[in-house]
Amino acid sequence: VELKNIFKTPCIRHNQTSRNTIRKVALCGGSGSFLVRTAIKDKADILITADIKYHEFFNEKIILADVGHYESEIFSTELIASIITKKFPTFAFSFSDNNTNPVNYL
C-alpha cells in the first residue's frame, strides 16, 4: 500500500510479499527488468521498476514490484531539477501539470 501512495498508482504488479523485512531496495525508473540479476547479486530484497515480464515474476530470490513505466519515471524531473538547482541556484524551472501517461486503469 505504501508503494502505491509513493508512486501515486492505483495498482502494483508484484510476485511475493512474504518477506518480513526489506533492508535493501533496488530502484530503476522505466524498463528495469534487465536488472533483476544485478539486484539479486547486490543482495537487494526488492526491485522496484516497470515493464517486468510475466515469467520474471516466478523468481523467488527477490521481490519484484512493477509500479508502471510512467509512474516509475515521474519523479525523475524533480530529482534532476534538484541536482541542477544545487549547481546553478538561479536556474528557474517550470513544471507542467499535463499528464502525458497514455495508460489508464479501471
Predicted regions and their residues:
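Active-site catalytic microenvironments in core metabolic enzymes, especially phosphate/sugar-handling
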Residues: 1-106
